[in-house]
């Protein structure tokens, strides 16, 4: 048997894409592998301040927050705070700004889910971040994914719309086939979009 850390190292080296191995660890319910890779990325972001590394660290924080959302809300809140800090560092690079803004918008959404009292402040901020991301990168599949997620998870009274959510998700799926739409160098998201489409259709 190979250790989780060895398998993670092999996967990372094989794909060259930390975002892919992070999301794979999340989908496959491997919290130790996810935590291990995130810890490395977080340290590297803090020391190097490189935008791409900080984006991956922010993504890891977001995924860990999702993992802890029900079982350990304090841990989830801490990860969401980290997501905000790392996303801000990632947003300093033009090609990643839209991706970082969309991710930060999602982290704000989770923060509101954890503590509804934050909605007054973070709700408008989340909306603005996502609108900016859509304006800056209208062909980013991940931006459309987060737009779909927001519309699907938000109650209708607050602007949620499953029909528009499905349109964004289906647009995202098509954009994953377009190499120009992935100019940011990121590769994650296609399985997540496909799963979201299934969820939206199941609840229609």
Report the location of each language-model feature.
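Sec-dependent N-terminal signal peptides
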Residues: 2-11
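Amphipathic alpha-helical repeat scaffolds of TPR domains
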Residues: 15-24, 47-68, 95-114, 139-155, ...
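Helix-turn-helix repeat elements of alpha-solenoid scaffolds
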Residues: 26-42, 73-86, 119-127, 165-173
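Alpha-helical junction/boundary sensor with strong preference for TPR arrays
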Residues: 45-48, 87, 94, 130, ...
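Surface-exposed, polar helix/loop patches in the mature regions of secreted/periplasmic/lumenal proteins
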Residues: 84-136
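Outer-membrane beta-barrel transmembrane domain signature
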Residues: 123, 127-131, 141-142, 149, ...
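Terminal, low-structured helical/coil segments at or just beyond the last alpha-helical repeat
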Residues: 163-166, 171-204
């Amino acid at each position: 048997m190979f250790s989780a850390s060895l398998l993670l190292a092999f996967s990372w080296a094989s794909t060259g894409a930390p975002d892919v191995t992070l999301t794979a660890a999340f989908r496959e319910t491997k919290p130790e592998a996810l935590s291990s890779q995130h810890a490395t990325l977080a340290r590297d972001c803090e020391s190097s301040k490189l935008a791409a590394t900080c984006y991956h660290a922010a993504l890891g924080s977001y995924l860990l927050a999702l993992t802890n959302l029900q079982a350990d809300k304090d841990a989830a809140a801490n990860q969401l705070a980290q997501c905000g800090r790392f996303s801000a560092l990632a947003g300093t690079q033009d090609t990643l700004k839209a991706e970082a803004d969309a991710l930060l918008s999602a982290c704000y959404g989770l923060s509101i889910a954890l503590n509804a009292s934050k909605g007054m402040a973070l709700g408008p901020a989340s909306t603005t971040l996502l609108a900016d991301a859509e304006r800056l990168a209208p062909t980013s599949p991940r931006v459309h994914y987060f737009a779909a997620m927001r519309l699907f998870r938000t109650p209708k009274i607050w602007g949620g719309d499953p029909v528009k959510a499905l349109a964004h998700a289906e647009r995202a799926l098509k954009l994953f086939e377009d190499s120009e739409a992935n100019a940011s160098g990121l590769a994650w998201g296609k399985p997540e979009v496909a799963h979201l489409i299934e969820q939206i259709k199941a609840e229609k």
